Amino acid sequence: CMLYTLPGIPCIYYGDEAGLTGGRDPFNRGCYPWGSEDTDLIGFHKMLGAFRKDAEVLSDGGFYPLSSALGCVAYLRYKAGERRVACIANKNPDTIDYVLNSDMQNMHVFCGGENIGGSVSIPPETACILTD
């Protein structure tokens, strides 16, 4: 989620979109797994790519950091007259409930979390995207 919502151009390493893993040099990437790709993961990347293409704020909007403590990184992308996009990444081994700022209360979850009355529940080692 962060790659698609941070400023700049998303760079997906060869095969990551299909679930390809690697090892140490010189085996850091094997052959593409034609016919055995992780189709759910490919669909997730396609969904994020379409979302980024549709959200102009992710191409040329501002960046405002919200939090970077206790294994949680959160930021807001904004542009006058455009919808806002927030990303909250949970690096913790446990689910977190991220309390939304008062001006973010009306944002809804696009992917990766669940709205719970003024906060967002984010599973372990995942990220959540919110939008207006």
Language model segments and positions:
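Aromatic/acidic polysaccharide-binding cleft in carbohydrate-active enzymes
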Residues: 1-39
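Hydrophobic, well-ordered secondary-structure elements that form the walls
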Residues: 3, 15, 48, 88-90, ...
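Short glycine-biased active-site loop of nucleotidyltransferases that positions the nucleotide triphosphate
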Residues: 21-25, 76-77, 120
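Aromatic- and carboxylate-lined catalytic core of secreted/periplasmic carbohydrate-active enzymes
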Residues: 32-66
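A conserved amphipathic helix/loop scaffold
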Residues: 60, 88-89, 115
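Carbohydrate-binding surface patches
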Residues: 66-102
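Solvent-exposed beta-hairpin/edge-strand motifs
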Residues: 102-113
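C-terminal beta-strand-rich structural cap/linker in extracellular carbohydrate-active enzymes
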Residues: 117-132
